[in-house]
């Protein structure tokens, strides 16, 4: 069975990252956060696995610089 990507909306990304909406949009504009996908005329969502991988990468990089 194929692993299907789960799409999450901005409020869930905010909960997962702890960042506010403006900061998330800033990171997106700087290509520092995975880009959202268009799911409608005025709606976007994020691929949950991409956000989770990004969070893990941030954690790993943070711990590398502490040591």
Model-derived segments and spans:
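Major-groove DNA-recognition helix of helix-turn-helix-type DNA-binding domains
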Residues: 17-45
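Polyanion-binding surface elements
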Residues: 1-23, 50-60
């Amino acid at each position: 069975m194929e692993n299907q990507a789960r799409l999450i909306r901005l409020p869930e990304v905010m909960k997962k990252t702890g960042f506010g909406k403006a900061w998330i949009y800033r990171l997106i504009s700087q290509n520092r956060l995975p880009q959202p996908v268009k799911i409608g005329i005025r709606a976007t969502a994020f691929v949950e696995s991409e956000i989770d991988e990004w969070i893990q990468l941030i954690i790993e990089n943070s711990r590398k610089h502490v040591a």
